[in-house]
A protein has these predicted regions:
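A contiguous strand-loop segment
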Residues: 24-118, 151, 329-330, 335
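Compact, glycine/acidic-enriched structural inserts
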Residues: 55-73, 110-149, 315-326
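C-terminus-biased signal that marks the final domain/tail of proteins
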Residues: 23-39, 152-154, 161-162, 171, ...
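A short, structured loop/turn motif at beta-sheet edges
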Residues: 95-97, 131-139, 244-251, 286-288
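Aromatic- and glycine-enriched pocket-lining scaffold segments that form the walls
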Residues: 137, 141-178
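Bacterial N-terminal signal peptides
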Residues: 8-19
Length: 347
């Protein structure tokens, strides 16, 4: 094919090897608009209902990275609103400083080394650890780049392996991608890292995207549900939609990109059994501190305005229940009710 004439050998090999790789879903994209308009969108693609609920966590919560043994302990500096999967861990969320955490599937993740004696941090609380402790990406990278702890990753309640990687953008538009490969933490930091999907590892995703950048999104874009194709489409569209400081248009633009990379409900692919339907989408307006949520099963989008929430130390944990068929529309900040915090899943 003519297009392959421009493709280096390594990228060509990636196209061939990833075309038959089973995929777990999820896509994340960061919109970098004018006047500090930073908006992050993500899809949650999973093969079953994750029984997701939203939680408001105040400042001053005492946390541990595991139930016992050598682990991390901290008291949360920042409050956050998070989406909990199965009520056992934080999969997505934003803290009161506009730092967002998006946890996505990555088959290639290997967290431990032989005879690893580093302190343990459960993968269920990994994203929450970042939201609790840091206001910016730079702060988080400075604290984590020493690779001083290892991730504990027990299987999910449905038996799926909890192999994940973490993306964090802040309100300035800076981003970082954290991956554990062969027991070593790999970090990519910079405003250019707007997109994250799933397999292969991030350095290989960038190689594939570089190839498609040469072709140009107006000429041709890959259209399957594979992670590498979703990466390319999100990379093109997040910068092709209207670039504006108007929050309503910016949020609408990000939602449109997230829908473009979503997997239709009920889709199954016989030769790629791990492709999963999109269950929900979130969009975080990091400038105005508004967290938007859209369930595939709901006719409405709702949002949570942080200015209407109480994150003060000593305030109760609050929960917005989504698992009972509840339908919300508009600003749901007032619908959160006091509730006990869920128990994070540890080994």
């Amino acid at each position: 094919m003519k297009t392959f004439a421009y493709l280096g050998a390594s990228a060509a090999a990636l196209l061939l090897t990833t075309s038959h790789t089973p995929i777990q879903g999820c896509t994340r994209a960061v919109y970098l608009g004018p006047d500090g308009m930073v908006v992050t969108g993500r899809t949650m693609d999973w093969r079953e209902d994750l029984r997701t609920n939203l939680y408001l966590f105040p400042r001053g919560m005492e946390r541990s990275g595991a139930d016992s043994g050598k682990t991390l302990h901290w008291i949360s500096k920042y409050g956050s609103v998070i989406a909990a999967g199965y009520d056992i861990g934080t999969s997505d969320g934003m803290n009161e400083k506009g730092l967002v955490a998006n946890l996505l599937y990555l088959t290639e993740s290997v967290y431990t080394r032989p005879d690893d004696t580093r302190p343990v941090l459960g993968i269920s609380i990994w994203a929450q650890y970042v939201l609790d402790n840091f206001a910016t990406v730079r702060e988080a990278v400075a604290a984590l780049e020493g690779d001083t702890f290892r991730i504990d990753a027990p299987d999910m309640p449905n038996g799926a392996r909890s192999t994940m990687h973490l993306a964090i953008p802040d309100s300035t538009g800076n981003s970082a991608i954290f991956e554990y490969l062969d027991g070593k933490l790999i970090i990519h930091e910079g405003r250019q890292y707007q997109i994250m999907t799933n397999s292969p590892s991030y350095d290989r995703q960038i190689t594939l995207d570089d190839y498609w950048q040469q072709i140009g999104g107006l000429v041709m874009l890959p259209g399957t549900n594979r992670a590498s194709d979703r990466f390319v489409r999100a990379s093109f569209y997040i910068n092709a939609v209207t670039q504006t400081s108007d929050p309503h248009l910016a949020v609408a633009g990000v939602f449109s990109v997230m829908r473009n990379v979503s997997v239709p409900l009920g889709i199954t692919t016989p030769d790629q059994p791990n492709i999963a339907s999109t269950r929900w989408r979130t969009v975080s307006d990091q400038k105005n501190r508004i967290y938007y949520f859209e369930s595939t099963l709901s006719p409405d989008i709702f949002w949570v305005s942080f200015d209407k929430l109480d994150f003060s130390a000593g305030a109760p944990v609050r929960k917005l229940t989504l698992t009972g068929g509840e339908i919300y529309a508009g600003d749901a900040a007032g619908e959160f009710a006091p509730a006990p915090p869920f128990k994070f899943l540890f080994e």
